[in-house]
Structures are given as C-alpha cells and as structure tokens.
C-alpha cells in the first residue's frame, strides 16, 4: 500500500499533542466519526494505532501506515465492555474462544463470573487459558458467592454459614480480589446462594472494599419481591461502603408492570445520598428462554421408574415420556407439586417466576398463542394453570418456546434512559444454527444502537456508547478501557450507524448482528471488513484502580 508522507509541521504537532513522534503507525483509521465514550459530542477525526496503543489524529491527517483503513461515514468508538457476560465458561476452551458472537457486536471486553459462579480455582483456569491460548475478547471477572459457598459448605448448604465457614469464604473472596477480580457477584435467586442471608453477603462484600471492588447481584426474588430484592442490593453495597450494581435489572411479570419506576426511585435516592448504585440491562422484553417442557420437574422416584435421563430435556424421549405421564391425573399432581414448589424445597422456575411471568414466544402448532402469558392461557382455557400448560404440551406436536420472564416494553425504555443504567448482555456463547439460547447473546449492543438510538431515538448515539464503554469500565476499575484517549489500549469498534442492528429473535436467537465493520482488540484486528481474522489477542484484565467512581450524573 502506498505510504503517505508526513510533513515536518505535522511531526512537530504530533509531539506537542502527546501522540508518538514517529512516522509509521501499525494501523490508521482515516476520516471517521469519533465517539470517544465519555458522552461528549461526536467529531470527525482519525485514529492511529501503534504497539497496541491508540492515538488521536487530526481529521485531515497525513499519518503514515502500511495499513490505512478509510472509515469515512463510519463511527469509531471504544470497544464495548459487557459487564454481565457468561462466555467465560466457553473461553477456557481453545475451540470456542474466538467469541465471534460478541466480536460481531463490537464487544472487546467481557466481564465473566456474574450471578456468583466463579471461584478462585475457576479464575486461575481462566487466567491460565488466556495466557496460553488468548481469546477473541479481553476478559475480566468477578469472584462468585455461589461458587465459594458451594466449595466451603459442600452439599450441606441449606442453612446459615457458621463463623468458621464464613471466615473460609472471606479468605476466598480476598484471594479472588488479589488475583484481579473486579468485585463480588451473587446469584441470590439460585442455590446455594439463596440460603445465604444478607449479613453473610455484607460480610463478604466488605472484603472487596480494600481492593476498590464493587458488588454485583442477580437479586434474590425479582418476581415476587422486586422492590425488596433491589433494596437488598443497595443495603449490602452501602453497608460494605462499595459500589453496587443490580444485574440485568427488569420488572418481570404482569404483577410488576410499571414498578420499574419505583426501583428507579430507590436508586435515585441512594445516589442522592452519595452511594454509587447503578444497574445494567439488556434491551429485550423477555428474560431467559426455553421450551415449555423444561419448566416441568419430574419427581425422582418417577424418573427412576422410567429410567429417564433428566439431564437432557430437549430429547424427544423426555418429551414423549413427560406427555404420557401427564395424562395420568395422579402422576400429574405429583409433577405439579415439585414443578411449582421445587423438589425438597429446591429451585423451580414456576416457583421463581410463575405463570404470570412466562409468555409464549413461538409455537408452530399454535401461532395464535404467541404473546400470551401462561396465566392468560389458563384463563382462556378455564383451567388451573398447571392443567392448562399440561394440555398445551400434550397437544403440541412441536416444541412450544417461552420466555421465563416477560417484561413490558415501556419498562425497558423507562430504565434504559436512566443516566446510571448500563447496557450489558447477560449473554452466553452463541453457536450459529443452534436453536437454544437468547437473542441477547448475539444482538444486545447493535439492538440498542440500531433500534433504540436510530429508530426510536430515546438515546443519543453518544449517550448509548457511554453506557457501553466508559461507564462500565470506570465502574469496575478498568480505567484505561472504554474510552478513546491517547496512549490507552487500542480496543476499538468501527460500525455503520445507518445499518447497525440485531438480527436474532426468540425463534432464531443465534443470528449474528450486522453493521459492525472492524473490531480491534489490544491493537490487533479481530474483525476486518466484516470478516473474522482468527486472531486471539484478548487477555485477562485485572482491576486497575482502587478508586471509587460515581458515574451517570
């Protein structure tokens, strides 16, 4: 490629402005629209990348590089930082560590271990894998309450921890922070964390305070006690004197429609009192998705008598046997009891979210039912809810898909515009062609930029990008990520603001988004002209700062 000569005057200006006094960059992004991640207005400019660092260049730069990429009309933004992401489980496998589904969204850093599921042992495995094999994205992580509680209390977890057990957990939290974790995460809706009381979590949260860590929570009872559960997050964080984040905040279920305004009031009050409370959100009106058969729990004695593999609920064998069992009213009652209450008090989706929170998202046999809540289905059929879903399952020849947590679109929008609310996916590793999963795993960030910024215009481009970049990065202490600034690591996304959009749906959740053109991680192109390069420059990112940040004013 023909090199462009730098004028002597430009060389002088470069040295004065703080970017390298040299003649050749590794990459130059030319004539783009720079949105720097801070919320400041977009401006025309160029970006030079050298030795993994970025440097702002004038819009009419003559900077020299062997790789000059013209990005006229495209947005140059910091790579997106996904603060609630589950792909860490896949990134330790060299066969699944490209993380293409997130690269194609513009994500350059994921924060793994949310919902309480990463122990010091897990963190070490993650660090070792990244050091040896790399990844398509950078990875930071939380230290997880569920994992350490499980390691300390084993199967005897349905009780309060003893002082000795609590001390063991404290030690593990400190170890996780010393390994570079950004804070403590909990999944208080799930076992064994659900058996830990507020005082236990406060004690553990206090251990991250000396490290400048934060508290991130999948709240305890988001459907049946939305306000109380979100208030608990605030109480834990403020008691530990650390920042607190309500993970994937939403108002799920018919009974909670409109209550997001009350939660917004709680957060606003806490912030007005000087507490660093924030939230993250994915831009969809439904939470986790599954097939209807998955919410049924068959009692163990019946499983044993049927020699049924309960671990593989998508197999035809399971559905066929389940349908036959439900035709027997005596057995149906037994299945109802454990499905609605959990076996021996354990977890059950019908107990956690309930019929008023589950909505049908796809049915090949009964398309007219799409959008209907299971509680509404029961009313229409004039049956008890469990009988209604049993009859639907029996009659359907093809899988019926549901969301386990339906959300009203107005509540999604009311939360999205709050200055302290971040964008995050809650997504997992996406495999094209796989029917399972949720569209958030391939569509979260482009959906915000395409649907909520370009189409609905409820957010400005600059504000949306702030919510995806500098705000999450600063909150968790990755202070040189999430912002375009001289000398910062070159994590960059280049996208077309006119075309970026998600393509995945609840029916086809693993379709890749469009509109992201180039992605750079630590100075290396992982996506070039919409094509995956195969490079894996991602690394483990330790918390950089011990300061406490309050964003969103």
Where are these regions (language model features)?
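Sec-dependent N-terminal signal peptides
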Residues: 4-13
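Histidine-rich, glycine-flanked metal-binding segment
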Residues: 21-27, 34-79
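Divalent metal-coordination and catalytic microenvironments
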Residues: 32, 47, 52, 73, ...
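Acidic, glycine-enriched loop/beta-strand segments at the rims
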Residues: 34-46, 400-406, 410-412, 456-465, ...
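Divalent-metal coordination cores built from histidine and acidic residues
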Residues: 71-76, 80-87, 93-186, 205-212, ...
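Active-site neighborhoods of metal-dependent hydrolases
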Residues: 142-143, 151, 155-163, 169-190, ...
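Divalent metal-binding pocket/active-site signature
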Residues: 175-233
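C-terminal cap of metal-dependent C-N hydrolases
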Residues: 341, 414-420, 425-426, 493-539
């Amino acid at each position: 490629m023909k090199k462009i000569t730098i004028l002597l005057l430009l060389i002088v200006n470069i040295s004065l402005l703080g970017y390298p006094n040299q003649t050749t960059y590794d990459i130059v992004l030319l004539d783009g629209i720079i949105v720097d991640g801070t919320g400041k207005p977009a401006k025309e400019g160029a970006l030079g990348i050298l030795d993994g660092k970025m440097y702002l260049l004038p819009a009419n730069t003559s900077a020299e590089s062997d790789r000059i990429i013209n990005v006229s009309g495209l947005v140059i933004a910091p790579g997106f930082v996904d603060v609630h992401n589950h792909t860490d489980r896949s990134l330790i496998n060299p066969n699944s560590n490209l993380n293409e589904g997130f690269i194609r969204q513009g994500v350059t850093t994921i924060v793994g271990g949310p919902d309480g599921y990463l122990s010091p042992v897990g963190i070490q495995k993650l660090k070792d894998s990244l050091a040896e094999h790399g990844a398509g994205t950078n990875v930071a992580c939380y230290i997880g309450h569920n994992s350490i509680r499980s390691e300390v209390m084993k199967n005897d977890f349905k009780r309060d921890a003893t002082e000795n057990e609590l001390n063991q957990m404290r030690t593990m939290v400190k170890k996780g922070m010393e390994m570079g974790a950004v804070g403590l995460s909990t999944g208080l809706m799930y076992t064994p964390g659900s058996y830990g009381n507020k005082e236990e979590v406060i004690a553990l949260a206090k251990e991250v305070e000396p490290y400048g860590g934060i508290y991130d929570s999948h709240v305890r009872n988001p459907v049946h006690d939305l306000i109380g559960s979100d208030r608990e997050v605030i109480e834990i964080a403020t008691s530990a004197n650390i920042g607190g984040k309500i993970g994937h905040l939403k108002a799920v279920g018919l009974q909670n429609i409109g209550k997001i305004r009350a939660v917004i009031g709680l957060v606003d009050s806490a912030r007005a009192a000087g507490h660093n409370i924030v939230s993250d959100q994915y831009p969809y009106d439904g939470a986790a998705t599954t097939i209807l058969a998955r919410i049924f729990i068959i009692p163990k004695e019946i499983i044993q008598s049927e020699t049924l593999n309960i671990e593989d609920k998508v197999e035809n064998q399971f559905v066929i046997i389940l349908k036959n069992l439900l035709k027997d009213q005596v057995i149906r009652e037994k299945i109802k009891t454990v499905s609605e209450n959990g076996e021996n008090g354990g977890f059950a989706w019908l107990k956690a979210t309930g019929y008023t929170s589950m909505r049908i998202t796809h049915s090949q046999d009964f398309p007219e039912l799409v959008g209907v809540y299971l509680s509404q289905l029961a009313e229409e059929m004039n049956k008890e809810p469990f009988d209604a879903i049993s009859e639907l399952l029996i009659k359907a020849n093809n899988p019926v898909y549901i969301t386990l947590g339906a959300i009203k679109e107005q509540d999604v929008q009311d939360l999205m515009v709050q200055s302290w609310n971040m964008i995050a996916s809650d997504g997992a590793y996406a495999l094209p062609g796989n029917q399972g999963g949720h569209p958030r795993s391939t569509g979260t960030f482009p959906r915000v930029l395409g649907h909520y910024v370009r189409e609905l215009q409820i957010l400005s481009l600059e504000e949306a990008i702030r919510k995806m970049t500098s705000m999450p990065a600063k909150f968790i202490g990755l202070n040189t990520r999430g912002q375009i600034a001289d000398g910062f690591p070159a994590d960059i996304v280049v996208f077309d603001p006119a075309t970026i959009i998600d393509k995945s749906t609840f029916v086809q959740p693993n379709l890749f988004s469009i509109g992201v053109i180039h992605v750079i991680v630590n100075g290396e192109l992982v996506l070039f002209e919409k094509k995956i390069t195969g490079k894996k420059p991602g690394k483990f990112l330790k918390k950089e700062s011990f300061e406490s940040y309050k964003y969103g004013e």
